[in-house]
Every structure is written in structure tokens, then in C-alpha cells.
Amino acid sequence: IQDFNKAQDVEAFVNQNSEMPYNGDFVFKSALPSESANQIFNLEEGGTYGPYKEGDFWKYSKVTGVKQIPDSVKVRKILVSYQGTPVDQGDMTRTQEQAEALADSLVGVVKNDAGKFAELAGEYTDDPRYKDQGGDMGWNRYTNARLMPEVKEFVYNNEEGSIEVIENQLGYHIVMVEEVTNMQKAVQ
């Protein structure tokens, strides 16, 4: 326990010394085990609690971060993909360089006029699920968001109106945080 308290790299320490892998997600109080939720949730950053039994495991928890995050976010997205990505069905002609240039151009337009997002999504997105909705991905609750990790990281850590290009294995996602609701404390 003393080694854990002194560990500079908590993730590496947990992964090396625990049967359960490190989980770096921020969680709301409702996601913590009811028997220990109050004790853990009231800790300051760096604070520890335990050991305590949860199911078949003995646990010792350390709060490595505390912040306010929204319970839900409303998101719009334009996916600009290119040859060789999982989105490519063999008919994609755009190169990665062309996709990056198009994404940079589109993000410039929507940062100047967010009202054009839906129109541009309908014209340019390579994600057929949201093409007819103008890129509208609807409301996503933090606890069960169906977002790719890179997109989830952006939308839950930025304010309403934030727009950014996020690159991953599918291509370039132009993501806009339309609305956020119910900011609340979360611990890591």
C-alpha cells in the first residue's frame, strides 16, 4: 500500500501489481460501489481509500483527478475518410492528404459559421449514419456514450460551440459540441 501511495505512474503500478487493469476513466458518484462511494467521492486529488472488499476482490483506490464534466452532450460530426480506412468499401478515391486538406477547409468554414455544419455534413460526411441528419449524433450520456475514445475525450472536455478536427483510424472527424447539460463532479 505504501508503494502505491508513492507511485508516480499509477497506471503502470496498477497494471504491474493488480489482477484488475487500471481504469483511468472519470466516474460520477453513481458509478462507484454504494458501500464505498461516499468515502471515495469525497477524497481530494491524491487521496486514497481502502483496502475494501468489492465482490471477489480487495481494492485500494486512489483519486488521481477531480473535475466537472457534463452528464450529456449533443454532438455533430462530419467524417472525412480516405483510401485504405475501414470506411473505404473499395470505391474511395480520396487520399489521406486530400482528406486532411478537406477537413481543414471544412473546419475553417464551420468555425466561422456553425450554421453551415448540417449542410456541409449532408454534402461531405463519409458516415452514412449521420448524412441525412446533417451530422447530428444526438445526445450522448457520459455513462454510456457510443463515441470513439478520441471523440469522447474531446466532447466531454470542451465547452458548447467547440469545434475541432480529430484524427483516428477512420479518417478526420470534424466534431462540434452543440450543447452540454448537467455539469457535475467526477473523480478519476
Regions found by a protein language model. Give the residues of each.
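Acidic surface patches and DE-rich sequence motifs
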Residues: L43, E54, N112, N168
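Short, well-ordered alpha-helical segments enriched in acidic and aromatic residues
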Residues: Q8-E19, F117-D126
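Soluble sensory domains of the PAS superfamily and closely related sensory modules
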Residues: I40-E44, F154-E159
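PAS and PAS-like sensory modules
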Residues: T48-P51, S162-V165
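Short coil/turn helix-boundary motifs
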Residues: F4-Q8, V110-A114, N158
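Well-structured core secondary-structure elements of compact alpha/beta domains
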Residues: I1-F4, Q16-Q39, S61-K111, D127-L147, ...
